[in-house]
Each structure stands twice: as C-alpha cells, then as structure tokens.
Amino acid sequence: MKEITVNGNDYKLEFSFEAAERKDFVSMMFRIVSGAALLEDAVDMENPTPKDMINGTINMVSDIPHICRTGFFVGLMENNPVSETEAKALMKSYMKENKIGYADLYEDLRKCMEEDGFFELSGITKTLNQLAENQKQRKVPQDHKQKSTGTK
C-alpha cells in the first residue's frame, strides 16, 4: 500500500482484492509482465522478426497511459470511494504535483502491486510459472537419441 497526497488530501493506493477482481486490469497487467504484448501481433510467435518486436514495443508503450489510468483507479478502490472520472482527475493532479510522466507512474504503481501481492493474488505469478515450466518441458534435449546414418 502506498499513501499519496493529491491536492492536499491523503489517499491510499492498494492493489488487493478490488484490483485482482477487475478482469480488464488483470488482463492488461498480464500482457505487460508476461511479454505477450510484445508478440501478440507477430505472424510467428516462436520466431518474431525485428519488425514484430518493434511493433510490439510500440503497442506496449502506447498502452502504458491507459494502464496507469485504470491502475490508479483500481488502486484507489480498496480504500477510497471515488468514481473512475474522479480517479482520472486525481491521477492527473498527482502527476502534475510530482512532475512525473506515465512511465514513472507505471513503475510506481507496479512496485506497489508487487509489495501488495497483487501478482500472486490475481494468479498472474502462478500462471507465468506454469507457462515457464511448460516451456521447459517442451524443450527436451534431443542429444540422447542416436543419430541416424543414411546408407543405401
């Protein structure tokens, strides 16, 4: 949980149950932390081209302001009864007062999510671990097999 002051008023940002129950927000964060945002439009996800990586990076960076706006709102939901419109106005004031951009705000929010256990509570960490394990199992070394020699 992070305590912030906006326009002279104190607020608490907390990424707990309210945040973890927002499907849209969990989806946004999964796309970013898993790296899926980088490759989701690639023709061949196993072998992305440099163009695919550039386009994926552009998409990911351009999603950050929306993620921040949604994240600020869901972070406030647990302890502060504000509407999404009010949360957006508070976020803008907070950014102006602290002279930060969206990239810095995203890092602050993500750090708060980690400290609050959002990634574990939402299932993102468990899913990423399962995906990594599945990836390891698919890539079984083949050097234990005998090489075939073709003699005709």
Where are the model-predicted features located?
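Charged interaction scaffolds used for protein-protein
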Residues: 1-10, 51-54, 58, 78-152
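Short N-terminal mixed-charge amphipathic segments
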Residues: 1-66, 152
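A structural signal for alpha-helix termini and helix-coil/disorder junctions
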Residues: 28-29, 35, 74-78, 115, ...
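An amphipathic alpha-helix signature
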Residues: 65, 69-73
